[in-house]
């Protein structure tokens, strides 16, 4: 599995994955799009701007949009890495949001996606990474715990875990 920034060449597989999320009415944490007016090429441009901190909406921070892909290039899920925390992110969303397309859940992709995302936090010198999940999401909780998450507290139904990213 590979976690990387989406490219123009990934359009078909990413759109297919987005359609699967929409059809199943499944949450797509770590992947953000306007279902009414979505244009893939504009989404790629917006992702680049968000990473550089350009044209950020109020209360947003610079972030990197990733997509995970299997060995044949099929899109598996999203991961969004926020490069710093504001109050809302500190209380609810954390540094990383991620999700795996419904048909590929339960196969270890969420753990691998989060592990690769944590390697990026290390490269970005984020030593303690906040990852959150709903109290009603035992699968995400298990992934976070398996990657070293330590529960700090629960706020309004959101479990907040810190993961220490060691320098090697």
What are these regions (language model features)?
Residues 131-141:
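Conserved beta-strand-loop-alpha-helix junction that forms the acyl-donor binding cleft
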